[in-house]
Amino acid sequence: MIDLLGLDLDGTLLSKTKKINNPSKLALTNLIAKKPSLKVMILTGRSVFSTLKHVEKLNSLFKKPIVDYFCCYGGAKLYQIEANKPQERYKFCLENSVVETTFSIIKKHRGLCLAYLDSYVSPYLCLAGNKLLGWFTKYFWYRKRCVFFNQNHLKQGILKISVYFLSAKRCKKVYEILKNTFQEKVNVLSFSNNLIEITHHDANKGYAIEYMAKREQLSLNRIAVIGDSWNDYAMFKKAKYSFAMSKSPSQLKLIATNTSNKTNRYRFSTLLNLISETIINQKAD
């Protein structure tokens, strides 16, 4: 039996068009119908602004809200929705020394840093590193949502740094440099051949799940999670039931309770149906 379902957004709940598709809506509706008390928690690397939009859309699908908690920035912030407004429950900002060291390394290797500021208003992103890539990112993508880094941004606090490289070979090299530089002091995750993400040591989805469970007096044995990438590993280790999407890293699949075998628009709904048919009302140990 489960009381909570933790969901990643990109590559999991959201389709390739960044929406909740009809098969997923139907499967989720059937799951909630089978257990009306079931709650959903969203856990994502996105910003609070982007995450909240999807939380609101998800809640609007049902007669009563199903999402009370969500974490964003890869677990650096946790929110609880009260009176239809998100209330911050914790946050982890990177130490200034970590930020400055990261920016220095990335600039040397001609990569681009996209740092997420602890801010509720735009601009909430700052750019550092390769100036040409930064210019294209600002003027063709984020526009008013981002600015170029200055020392005052350290006072605001930085929740997460996304690092981009055009060269996969260089990205792999810098990933190893960052891992060796920081050791276990921060989370350094390789998301793709061109993307690295850096967060505070305690800023992960596993911590978010555990924190929420203690706050709501829920057992981790009654929680299931679904994800598809490295930043889902921590929550897979915490929850009793974990389900990996078909294109997940092999190490994530190894620790998963089950894995989707679909790569089409049914890849997420297949896992929801599996949960509905097996563990949704199964007796807890």
Curated annotation (Swiss-Prot):
Give the binding site residues for phosphate. Answer: L9, T44, G45, K205, N231
Q: Which cofactor does it need?
A: Mg(2+)
Q: What is its EC number?
A: 3.1.3.-
Which UniProt key words apply to this protein?
Hydrolase, Magnesium, Metal-binding
- Please name the Gene3D superfamilies in this protein's record: 3.30.1240.10, HAD superfamily/HAD-like (3.40.50.1000)
Q: Which InterPro entries match?
A: Cof (IPR000150), HAD-like_sf (IPR036412), HAD_sf (IPR023214)
GO terms for CC? cytosol
The chain's coiled-coil residues are none
Annotated active site: D8 (nucleophile)
Leader sequence range is none
Q: Where does Mg(2+) bind?
A: D8, D10, D228, S229
Q: Listed GO molecular functions?
A: magnesium ion binding; phosphatase activity
Matching Pfam families, A to Z?
Hydrolase_3
Main enzyme class: hydrolase
- Which Cys pairs are S-S linked? none
- Quote the PANTHER family the UniProt record gives: HAD SUPERFAMILY HYDROLASE-LIKE, TYPE 3 (PTHR10000:SF8), PHOSPHOSERINE PHOSPHATASE (PTHR10000)
Question: To which protein family does this belong?
Answer: Belongs to the HAD-like hydrolase superfamily. Cof family.
Q: Which NCBIfam families match?
A: Cof-subfamily (TIGR00099)
Name of protein: Putative phosphatase MG125
